[in-house]
Amino acid sequence: MARPLVPSSQKALLLELKGLQEEPVEGFRVTLVDEGDLYNWEVAIFGPPNTYYEGGYFKARLKFPIDYPYSPPAFRFLTKMWHPNIYETGDVCISILHPPVDDPQSGELPSERWNPTQNVRTILLSVISLLNEPNTFSPANVDASVMYRKWKESKGKDREYTDIIRKQVLGTKVDAERDGVKVPTTLAEYCVKTKAPAPDEGSDLFYDDYYEDGEVEEADSCFGDEEDDSGTEES
């Protein structure tokens, strides 16, 4: 019996998932929320060493549309985040996740928005860049933006913003312990890229559902650019 047609988005997502598990982006771990659903991913983000996010374990979800990669996925933090470019809902305000339409009112260039040549790897790199370098122009969280600017302008003397971040980082340790996750705390640990273990029999069957034999082959914020801001620790 002929196999049913598989949407091209499933094939694209499977290739990306395997690639990210075999060669992870530093500071990230991606898995499926449900093994039978390629359109919903769980993302674990580890806070980069030598920043105020160091030691943090932040959980997020990536939800892909059926026409991916022609439309962007949605990225939402499950962990409570205090950041100028993250809404209270956890949704990230970043240009790369916006559909490729020409909207002069947005303050974004079309080239800053999503296009089909981009992928999950570029999204993850954009997210970690945004965490460390917030864009405070028309922010998603105004209060966080005001606090961040005070911290920046005081050269780190006003610590209200960073104190909130450190408190949130400490709070993520409970999630890490519950999930059995060892959070990297040194640059050496953070930069180690480990390949995913070989798939078991069940996983082979899962992959076979999407591919015929031999078929598998080898950040701007949402409101436009501004001067670089840094989330790294200052003396």
Curated annotation (Swiss-Prot):
This is Ubiquitin-conjugating enzyme E2 R1. Residues 8-174 form the UBC core domain. GO terms for cellular component: cytoplasm; nucleus. The modification Phosphothreonine is found at T232. PROSITE patterns: UBC_1 (PS00183), UBC_2 (PS50127). PANTHER family: UBIQUITIN-CONJUGATING ENZYME E2. Its EC number is 2.3.2.23, 2.3.2.24. The gene is Cdc34. It comes from Mus musculus. Pathway: Protein modification; protein ubiquitination. Phosphorylated by CK2. Phosphorylation of the C-terminal tail by CK2 controls the nuclear localization. It is found in: Cytoplasm; Nucleus. The C-terminal acidic tail is required for nuclear localization and is involved in the binding to SCF E3 ligase complexes, and more specifically with the CUL1 subunit. InterPro entries: Ub_conjugating_enzyme, UBQ-conjugat_E2_core, UBQ-conjugating_AS, UBQ-conjugating_enzyme/RWD. Residues 190-235 are annotated as: SCF-binding.
